[in-house]
Amino acid sequence: MHWPRHMAWRYSFLRCTARSNGTVCHIKKGLIAAERDQSALRQARLDWITHRQPRMRAEPHRLVFIDETAVKTNFTRLRGRAPVGERLYGTAPFGKWGTQTFIVGLTQNALIAPWVINGAMNGPAFDTYIETQLAPALDPGTVVILDNLSTHKSPRAAKALKERSCWFLFLPAYSPDLNPIEMAFSKLKAHLRRIGARTFDALLQALGDICNLFDP
């Protein structure tokens, strides 16, 4: 059932104010790593923000941010409209569904070198991605920025970039918030939930269509 916009806004407002004191509303809590409180990590993040980021803004055409994220064939919309006091239900596969890993690069104007594997990312898969997908798509002098994970610290992958006159630059530990590709993934998953692909082939098609339409 579809509700008029003014009614939908009223329901959303009432959900918030019903559990508030007039100035504070109960909302979902975000979590950050407790390890960020360590002095060495605080300094590393400060150095990144005050020294590296200004240089990045001066030469954005040289940057590619990469990361991986899980994509599933049971994605569905998580929110909708309903009268106050009534639950809202939807349908999604609870039994047979698949989880894949999607890895891609974010430039200043596009998503490049998208790649999907079944299961979790590991060292050999990451090496293959860099060698066969990402490195051939890079211009000489490109800096590839990524999370500080052991899987990413591969001599084989670094060699593949070096052969293209490119190199890795690792983010401070526990700092995914410093990688703008996280915002791209948020948009991408919102589209996937809207599309609701239920097979691997349909998921691949949806990811390709989204990447082609993406505008950072």
Put a short name on every predicted segment.
Residues M1-P216:
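Short functional hotspots at interaction and active-site rims
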